[in-house]
Amino acid sequence: MADPLPINLVVKFGGSSVATADRMMEVADIVCGFEQTTVPIVVLSAMGKTTNLLLQAGSEALNASPKSVGSLHSLREIKELHRETAERLQVDDATVDDMESLLLQLTQLLVGISIMQDLTPRAKDSLVSFGERLSTRLFSAYLRAKGIPSKQYDAPEIGVITNDNFTNADVEYEDTLSELRATFAGLMDGTRSPEIPVVTGFLGRGKTTGAITTLGRGGSDLTCTLLGAALGLDEVQVWKDVDGVLTSDPRIVDGARPVTRLTFEEATELAFFGATVLHPLSMQPAAEYTDGAMGVRVKNSYNRSAAGTLISKTRDMMDGEDLVTSIVLKRNVTLVDIVSTRMLGQIGFLAKVFEIFNSEGLSVDVVATSEVSVSLTLDPAKTLWERDLIDEELESLMNAFTGVAKTSYRRGYSILSLICNVDKSSEILERVFRVLGRESVNVQMMSQGASKSNIALIIRDDQATHTLRVLHHEFFGA
């Protein structure tokens, strides 16, 4: 008998790809349809809207009596979805028992939230973890029911180590990569019987507390690239519900089309400035811990034949082509203006400015400076629990600048980001401002980062959708 092949691919499937029992069956067909020489690890998100339902259940539990928690609509919906899925997939009794145990633990956690009348960040992470823990158990059991050896793994237990910043934890890379390598060493060197590992995405373990943490919205993408980097693979695949990374948001721009190639830098900028197809930090393991040797391919689980998008360290930039790769929109940002003549020639002024933002717990996106002023944008917290900045937070920020600088803020703006060849910025901006002038759109602020791949324009929210469409037509003709 031939020696077992080592793991040579990591594939991640998002929530929409595993939203129902039928979708899980489709994903299983994809996994089983790889060439015989391909041995994958499968990373899964929670089923469909499960994460949102878990968040809703947590909020509802705060307003419910402990005795009524079991009848919460969101909790009933979660139980119904997973029980129906288990029945449709015809999983074994042991998996059903495991599922019911998790659903009981979920109910008990919600009762505790109701009793304590508190939903701490730590409790939130524990709460939403049930989505991935349930989906992976059901999917792994379905593979086994089809006669395919498979084992389920919870990422917090196999080595995804983070700090203890609950709801948006940062990965401890050296610890994580080492532990993941150790976990799967037997499957890499052929000393263990071949099986398809099915791993929870999105979850980690706090280094100090040992508690479950989460990696922020879309964190399963990061789990995927972490595994690929740890195992030294040539490629990982992130399967979504679109044909790869697109030239714009297809929900806004009808003519958005797939981008064939991207660099890690371009993909990171896209994710950070509004493209929801990838987690902003998911490129970091590939770019920094494989020396750029690992590619990330984005594929469509609803359209397997689509080529998708390959993201790599470098790509060819055809002269005269690829002026703009994609245009993305981030809405509902706040614009802050800081003015002080003390900036003139003063060492450390900007450091003091950013220390104030740090002490206020506010994240800065885009920055533009002049001799006596700084303008920047603030974004809602980049976590699973996104929300609007509230007036009290902004007023606290204004007060923190008392005696330092004159500060004001304006709400209701959007960041329109052109992921582009900045070496051609003169041509790009000439065309951009010609269109904006024609459409009577005023730019409140502009920033061109050191990355050489992004130009950010700050415009009013109420003009953002139309502006995105006309600029997309200008550069992509659709």
Briefly describe each language-model feature range:
Residues 1-278, 282-283, 458-460:
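Nucleotide/pyrophosphate-binding catalytic subdomain
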Residues 47-48, 242-244, 296, 300-305, ...:
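Glycine-rich beta-alpha junction loops
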Residues 149-151, 295, 442:
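Conserved beta-strand segments of alpha/beta enzyme cores
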Residues 195-202, 213, 294-300, 308, ...:
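Extended, compositionally biased low-complexity polar/Lys-Gly-rich tracts
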Residues 235-239, 297-298, 365:
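Short hydrophobic alpha-helical runs that function as membrane-insertion/retention elements
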Residues 305-478:
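A conserved regulatory-domain signal marking ACT and ACT-like small-molecule sensing domains
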